[in-house]
C-alpha cells in the first residue's frame, strides 16, 4: 500500500505480495519435508511446477492423504489481503480453525510492539474484536470468520514449536490468544 502513495501500481504491488507468499510457502514446505513431514504447495495463481493450482477438492484430497497443504498467493486477486485469502481457504475446506502466525503471542488491546501498556486477551469474541477496532486481521477476514464460525488462534510464529501446539482447538466463538 505504501508504494501506491508514491505512484506505483497497486495491482502490481499486490501481485508482488502474492509471489512473496509463494516464496515463503516453498521455504516452509522445504523445512517440513526436511523434518520428514509430507507437504504440498498449492497456489491461487497458476505456476506449475512451482506449486499446484489450488482447488478445494485437491486440497482436501492431499490433507486426507496425510500431507500438510500450504496454500499460497492469497486469493489470487489484488486488493485482498493474505488474511482474507486464509479465511476464504479455511472456510472453503471446512477447517476446524484458522491459525494466524504473527510476531506477537496473541491478541492485545493495542500493538504490544508499540504500546508497552497493551493487555493480552485470552479469549475474545469476533464482535468484541470488531467493536474495539483491534487489528488482529483485516475487517473482511474477521467478518468472514465470524459469519462462518471459523475460530481464530493467534500465536507467535517465531517461537519454536508453536505451529505444532495449535492443532486441536476447543470450540469457541471468536479468537483466542495462547
Predicted ranges, named:
Residues 166-171:
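Conserved small/polar residues in nucleotide/adenosyl-binding loops
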